[in-house]
Amino acid sequence: MSNIQNMSLEDIMGERFGRYSKYIIQERALPDIRDGLKPVQRRILYSMNKDGNTFEKGYRKSAKSVGNIMGNFHPHGDSSIYDAMVRMSQDWKNREILVEMHGNNGSMDGDPPAAMRYTEARLSEIAGYLLQDIEKNTVSFAWNFDDTEKEPTVLPAAFPNLLVNGSSGISAGYATDIPPHNLSEVIDAVVYMIDHPKASLEKLMEFLPGPDFPTGGIIQGADEIKKAYETGKGRVVVRSRTEIEELKGGKQQIIVTEIPYEVNKAVLVKKIDDVRVNNKVPGIVEVRDESDRTGLRIAIELKKEADSQTILNYLLKYTDLQVNYNFNMVAIDHFTPRQVGLQKILSSYISHRKDIIIERSKFDKAKAEKRLHIVEGLIRVLSILDEIIALIRSSDNKADAKENLKVSYDFSEEQAEAIVTLQLYRLTNTDIVTLQNEENDLRDLITTLSAIIGDEATMYNVMKRELREVKKKFANPRLSELQAESQIIEIDTASLIAEEETFVSVTRGGYLKRTSPRSFNASSLEEVGKRDDDELIFVKQAKTTEHLLLFTTLGNVIYRPIHELTDLRWKDIGEHLSQTISNFATEEEILYADIVTSFDQGLYVAVTQNGFIKRFDRKELSPWRTYKSKSTKYVKLKDDKDRVVTLSPVIMEDLLLVTKNGYALRFSSQEVPIQGLKSAGVKGINLKNDDSLASAFAVTSNSFFVLTQRGSLKRMAVDDIPQTSRANRGLLVLRELKTKPHRVFLAGGVQSDTSAEQFDLFTDIPEEETNQQMLEVISKTGQTYEIALETLSLSERTSNGSFISDTISDQEVLVARTR
């Protein structure tokens, strides 16, 4: 018969993964609600206790303990066992350490511990209370992995370890994050709940107001703590403890003495220093980790004029000096993972301790009764001592003596065994008194144990007494301060930024930088660093407190605070937007750049190749949350081939749109509605099917120029294009030719000397040259031509203009721009 079974992969995977999930949920990552331990932690404690590796004895090599645990109870890698052992020894991870370790057991800086062959370990004193009475049949045992030895499924847990030390872990479909608490407060809450089983959460929180982290800190948010204790989920703010320390010379420094739970100190110091290096907060001179064996201390030295409170607020908001701690209190309850609140945790622990105390009392009672039975036999022997001695002397051997005692004097098997093994010195008068006293003590003990077993009130009194003994022995003060409200961190951004003069430059290809006036003035404008195939489109003097807006041909806008731009030399290329903006496309170009002081007022107009136009408010461009990594839309394009032709600030003038086929339309800018960023706009000009928009500009002068792809140029009067309404076809500004027709390559206003300053992107740059508007044309063969637009004579509307050179018509235009 074949052992091969045909099963679907879906069924096999589902069944196997379900089995695996159940294993890692119950046997690996989640703690038991009764003793607060994961299986590996329980096995470590039990194995070390079984081997006598306890607090009152000397330390033993960690490797020996790990080997015993792995060989007897936990058949997994030694690293997982050692890591768990090390964590239980770290006083910055546990409120009460369960393992004491000699040697390097890691640090708050995330340093790894020394190898287990170098360190030594033993159980801590309080860990002994988790294992107390385990030898008295108080908990159930199960066979280990190879059925050679039994291990406990839970520990007796004489204190509520789940709350005291907390727990964290991730399993299949479940995760847990239970914070540590103060031992005294937890025990007080348990004692109160023993007396008041239906105690309200509010009353319990009078005894246990919140977590108590081993690293201290300030916990904010009483309402969230209550929510977490009620539902098992919640989020609180954990803030570092800081103080402002005065230094000589009027300087100050921020001193950090406590940091949030689970925060890596070295990483925190590095992040704070990164803030200094990147000048995100001006005013930080130095960041030092001054921690030593006396305690944690991080010093943040400030400049003399620095605003210490504003800098501290910034660091709290943008570094791990303040973090959110998320409660997710999941534990194994009756073999099932459950999200539990405070009342459920306490009641489960009380129920567990009830079982432990009753089982322990039954064990002790049975032991006392067994001993009492023997003591009664010994006392009876002493009353008939001569007869017993004679009977034993007449017996053939020990077995015969025992049988004679049982037959002649009705002793039990146990009593007979005790009599025949009795040592002669025990027959003195003193020992008779001792036996009688022992009998009385045993009877009292049995009575007490019977009361504990039979009377619930007596049992609970024992439970409370034992808890109070643990509290008395191990109580320590609360480390974390609790604050009812979460404080909102307000940062005066303006006060963080040192106002400095700088020059901002942007290229069409997306390179940008800021340059100090010293570096800028040491070079000429032509020495700007850029790629050979790129073009400088924007240079302007600005303040570091201002803002830069970049509008692209694909309808995206990019925001950058000036102070966040990389400060580089004028001859450096700059930083490309693709390094930070994840959605900056390869074919995307910068169309327009603008520096603004505020976003309170201002309008922009955008015109696309498909002839659509819109106005939108600058207020909608105020910094968005993901501005550092993503651009946002300012206009919706109709299709993938559509591009934005013009973007400019709105002025109260007419707009003039010119198409490639030579149609020009003039209308008032007030006809264009103000719309949201996601809209595509309205029709600006009625295009023919084979036509598209070439240029659009505001009418701010009396004339404009038209350049064709063949290199023909003309200047014509604005009045030749009368004002009409938007969405019309417009008038032709070129004469149609049957062969080699002219198509508009670029059109724009011809600015006068007085009006040019308003539109010149380089007005803040000191130049000796006259401010004359020039048209630069580069042919496809690389020839460059420059024409002073004001020197052109006015042409008729229907003329095609004049070629700028004799050979340009054969070469055609590659690039054209005004400056």
Curated annotation (Swiss-Prot):
Top class in the EC scheme: isomerase
Source species of the chain: Streptococcus pyogenes serotype M3 (strain ATCC BAA-595 / MGAS315)
Keyword Isomerase appears in the UniProt entry: yes
GO molecular function terms noted in the UniProt entry: ATP binding; DNA binding; DNA negative supercoiling activity
Similarity annotation: Belongs to the type II topoisomerase GyrA/ParC subunit family. ParC type 2 subfamily.
Topo IIA-type catalytic domain span: 30-496
Active site residues according to the UniProt entry: Y118 (o-(5'-phospho-dna)-tyrosine intermediate)
Site note Interaction with DNA, residues: K38, H74, H76, R87, K93
Highest rank taxon of the organism: Bacteria
Name of the protein: DNA topoisomerase 4 subunit A
E.C. no: 5.6.2.2
Keyword tags: Cell membrane, DNA-binding, Isomerase, Membrane, Topoisomerase
PROSITE patterns: TOPO_IIA
Assembly with partners or alone: Heterotetramer composed of ParC and ParE.
Protein's job: Topoisomerase IV is essential for chromosome segregation. It relaxes supercoiled DNA. Performs the decatenation events required during the replication of a circular DNA molecule.
Reactions listed under catalytic activity: ATP-dependent breakage, passage and rejoining of double-stranded DNA
GO biological process: chromosome segregation; DNA topological change
GO cellular component: chromosome; cytoplasm; DNA topoisomerase type II (double strand cut, ATP-hydrolyzing) complex; extrinsic component of plasma membrane
Site feature Transition state stabilizer, where: R117
Cell compartments where the protein resides: Cell membrane
